[in-house]
């Protein structure tokens, strides 16, 4: 497990990082209850249980915590939507189905510090009056599944789950559910269908999950990092949380730095930090190379170039620059990377993972792949570039969920910034890039030669 927070915090005079969730990832057995309690674990829960549920929701709302799964919707407001006194059971579902290319923050968090999530779940369930919560985990990550099961067992044994938690009268059952590997189940309503035992496909909304979610009952669906951030807010205070980040995007978050960089890993910092600052503190791009393009929030967000190095990485800053913060998956590519090749691979992923429910997404992603493969192989025509734009435009905003939008984003942005590179594939009858040079071992191979 790589953690860079402690090292950089000690050596960087600006102290740009804000390790909270990742503060003790580098300790031995950081995932255990004993280590978590040494770092004030479950103290936030004690303070939460001393508040009335409605006051707790208002407190989280006032903290300014926004969803960390991509959309950035205020967490407290989502909790507030749950109707009270309706006589129905309420559910909390944690979306841990992290599957998008480049997105890799929730899995390390669950692996290194699962109790932060469990504590956050208990707090959230107390707030929304829920007695049953679920963690929907991506099925392929079996080591994380085992670690989660062990953490849940520890929490039950210590009285943080089960009946009459800490003498508060709160009863809570927590179920860990492993998905079957479908990316579409990361969409909240498809996730609920999957959890109910049906094929994962997005639902028509309204009704929204807050009214009719799991088993047609009021349900809150939150991201792992969103819920795991709640205990620190309760323990250290909303003013402490708001002292970090920006006015409209307060607090800390995990940035996943990957690609052609010298120091890939999870960097926990206040919202509003820039990629330039993150690269400066992590060693920059790999030696001898320069940044060509990057994604601010995973493959589903419009790409940026080196012109955007100083864009504040918060919801407003990235949005104003023409993209989305998304999951803060900062994939960085240097000048050896073929944009057409990268976009083709991403589009192949979306075509494969489309559930097929919506015709624009099902058919559109298929035809995008056919055109991109032809262009990459040197068989394309100039008219194909406008055709790519047209097909992407017919997908964007015309499906039940955002998978189609995610497939269209790289098409629009790559043609905007790198149209000449597409044209070079067509006029030059093939890709001018050597794929081997963009591999992690390319420079080592050249040195040996």
Curated annotation (Swiss-Prot):
Positions binding [4Fe-4S] cluster in this chain are: 355, 358, 361, 401
- This entry's Enzyme Commission designation comes to 7.1.1.-
Entry similarity comment: Belongs to the complex I 51 kDa subunit family.
Q: Please list the coiled coil stretches.
A: none
Query: Which leading EC class covers this enzyme?
Result: translocase
Q: What does this protein do?
A: NDH-1 shuttles electrons from NADH, via FMN and iron-sulfur (Fe-S) centers, to quinones in the respiratory chain. Couples the redox reaction to proton translocation (for every two electrons transferred, four hydrogen ions are translocated across the cytoplasmic membrane), and thus conserves the redox energy in a proton gradient.
Binding-site residues, NAD(+)? 67-76
Species: Streptomyces coelicolor (strain ATCC BAA-471 / A3(2) / M145)
Protein's UniProt name: NADH-quinone oxidoreductase subunit F
Q: Which reaction does it catalyse?
A: a quinone + NADH + 5 H(+)(in) = a quinol + NAD(+) + 4 H(+)(out)
One biological-process term from Gene Ontology? Answer: cellular respiration
Q: Which GO terms describe its molecular function?
A: 4 iron, 4 sulfur cluster binding; FMN binding; metal ion binding; NAD binding; NADH dehydrogenase (ubiquinone) activity; quinone binding
What cofactors are annotated for this protein?
A: FMN; [4Fe-4S] cluster
Give the note describing cofactor binding and stoichiometry: Binds 1 FMN.
Sorted alphabetically, which Pfam families does this protein's record hold?
Complex1_51K, NADH_4Fe-4S, SLBB
Keywords, ordered alphabetically? 4Fe-4S, Flavoprotein, FMN, Iron, Iron-sulfur, Metal-binding, NAD, Quinone, Translocase
């Amino acid at each position: 497990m790589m953690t860079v927070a402690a090292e950089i915090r000690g050596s960087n005079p600006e102290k740009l990082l804000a390790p909270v969730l990742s503060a003790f990832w580098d300790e031995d057995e950081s995932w255990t209850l004993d280590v978590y309690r040494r770092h004030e674990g479950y103290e936030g829960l004690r303070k939460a249980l001393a508040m009335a549920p409605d006051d707790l929701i208002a407190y989280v709302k006032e903290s300014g915590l926004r969803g960390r799964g991509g959309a950035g919707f205020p967490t407290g407001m989502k909790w507030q939507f749950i109707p009270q006194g309706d006589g129905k059971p309420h559910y909390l579902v944690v979306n841990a189905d992290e599957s998008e290319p480049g997105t890799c923050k929730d899995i390390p968090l669950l692996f290194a510090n699962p109790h932060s999530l469990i504590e956050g779940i208990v707090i959230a369930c107390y707030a929304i009056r829920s007695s049953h919560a679920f963690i929907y985990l991506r099925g392929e990550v079996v080591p994380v599944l085992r670690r989660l099961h062990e953490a849940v067992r520890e929490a039950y044994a210590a009285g943080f789950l089960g009946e009459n938690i800490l003498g508060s009268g709160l009863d809570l059952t927590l179920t860990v559910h492993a998905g079957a590997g479908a990316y579409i189940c990361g969409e909240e309503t498809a996730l609920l269908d999957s959890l109910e035992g049906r094929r994962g496909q997005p639902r028509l909304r309204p009704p929204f999950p807050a009214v009719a979610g799991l088993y047609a009952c009021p349900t809150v669906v939150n991201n792992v990092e969103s819920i795991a951030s709640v205990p620190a807010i309760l323990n250290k205070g909303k003013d402490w949380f708001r002292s970090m980040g920006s006015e409209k995007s307060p607090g800390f978050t995990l940035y996943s730095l990957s690609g052609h960089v010298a120091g890939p890993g999870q960097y926990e910092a206040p919202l509003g930090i820039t990629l330039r600052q993150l690269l400066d503190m992590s060693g920059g791009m790999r030696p001898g190379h320069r940044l060509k393009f990057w994604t601010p929030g995973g493959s589903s967000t419009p790409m940026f170039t080196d012109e955007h190095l100083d864009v504040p990485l918060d919801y407003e800053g990235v949005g104003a620059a023409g993209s989305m913060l998304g999951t803060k998956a900062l994939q960085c590519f240097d000048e050896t990377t073929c944009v057409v090749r990268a976009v083709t691979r991403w589009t192949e992923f979306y075509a494969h993972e489309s559930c097929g429910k919506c015709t624009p997404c099902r058919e559109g992603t298929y035809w995008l792949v056919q055109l991109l493969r032809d262009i990459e192989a040197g068989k394309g025509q100039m008219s194909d570039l406008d055709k790519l734009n047209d097909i992407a435009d017919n997908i964007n905003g015309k499906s039940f969920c955002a998978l189609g939008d995610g497939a269209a984003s790289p098409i629009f942005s790559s043609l905007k910034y790198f149209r000449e590179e597409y044209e070079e594939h067509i006029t030059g009858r093939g890709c001018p890039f050597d794929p081997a040079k963009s591999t992690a071992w390319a420079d080592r191979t050249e040195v040996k030669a």
